[in-house]
Design a protein with these regions (language model features):
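Short, small/polar-rich loop/turn modules that mediate ligand/substrate recognition or access, typified
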Residues: 171, 176, 239-241
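Active-site helix of classical SDR
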Residues: 121, 155, 163
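Substrate-binding pocket helix/loop in short-chain dehydrogenase/reductase
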Residues: 96-98, 102-107, 209
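C-terminal helical subdomain
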Residues: 179, 187, 203-235, 239, ...
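Residue(s) in the substrate-gating loop at a strand-loop-helix junction
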Residues: 139
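Short C-terminal tail/terminal secondary-structure segment
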Residues: 92-95, 144, 229, 240-252
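Conserved glycine-rich cofactor-binding loop
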Residues: 8, 15-17
Length: 252
């Protein structure tokens, strides 16, 4: 019997690197999984890759109430009430100093990371089973600063405040709410960030980050997925309102 046997999980940003790795791990543990992702080709590839009758996918703009309601209701209609709500969707902005940061880019980034997580909780919690789990993907920079990334860092800190508040409110239903904080991950999303840092600072950002991490490397997506599984499952049955750092000791 798997750790998530028969449980219904929804993952926003589900066709991306961390979402897909988590979906694969959840399916291996017996879950039914709904992937939420705007990119049609990416969704199709994810479904083909996972190749399971227990996975489906839906297009939705997580930053809009209509989109959030739609993916929640689609999940419930397809699989039943939700046990694991994994708010994992993310986007990127430019890597520039705060004095040069475009206001529209700032707003767009917070819309996905912060408003998206808020809407997931607002519309997802009423459709969840008691005793479930909410996971919000933050970042190691949700606990530190990072020059050139004012919008991303602000959003990742804001998610922690959201998590702690929702955890207090959801506790009466035994729903646990936590943030997951990956350090640098070996994927295309992180590479684009590092390319921006390299241009801004005139350094090899990938090497610089590896030197900042005591384990001296980037994480693999499947390592982050294992931590998501921990938060999703009963392994973390007495864990709520906390920040799980998966950063190779970067914040140690």
């Amino acid at each position: 019997m798997g750790l998530l046997d028969g449980r219904v999980c929804v993952i926003t940003g589900g066709a991306g690197s961390l979402g897909l790795a988590s979906a694969r791990r959840f399916l291996d543990e017996g879950a039914k999984v709904m992937l939420v992702d705007l990119e049609g080709a990416t969704r199709a590839r994810a479904l083909a890759d996972l190749a399971s009758p227990n996975v489906d996918a839906v297009a939705a703009d997580v930053s809009q109430a209509t989109g959030a309601r739609a993916y929640i209701e689609r999940t419930v209609a397809r699989f039943g009430p939700i046990d694991v709500l994994f708010s994992n969707a993310g986007n990127q902005g430019p890597v520039v100093p705060v004095t040069e940061y475009p206001e529209d880019a700032f707003d767009a980034l917070l819309a996905v990371h912060v408003r998206g997580a808020f809407l997931a909780c607002k519309y997802g919690l009423p459709r969840m089973n008691d005793g479930g789990s909410v996971i919000i993907t933050s970042s190691v920079v949700g606990a530190m600063g990072a020059p050139g990334s004012v919008a991303y860092v602000t959003a990742k800190h804001a998610q922690v405040g959201l998590m702690r508040t929702v955890a207090r409110e959801a506790a009466r239903r035994r729903i646990r709410v936590n943030t997951l904080h990956p350090g640098p991950v070996d994927n295309a999303f992180q590479l684009r960030i590092e390319q921006g840092i390299s241009r801004l600072a005139g350094v090899d950002a990938t090497r610089m980050l590896d030197e900042m991490i005591p384990l001296a490397r980037h994480a693999r997506p499947e390592e982050i997925a294992r931590s998501a599984l921990y938060l999703a499952s009963d392994l973390s049955s007495f864990v709520t309102a906390t920040t799980l750092m998966v950063d190779g000791g970067m914040r140690g």
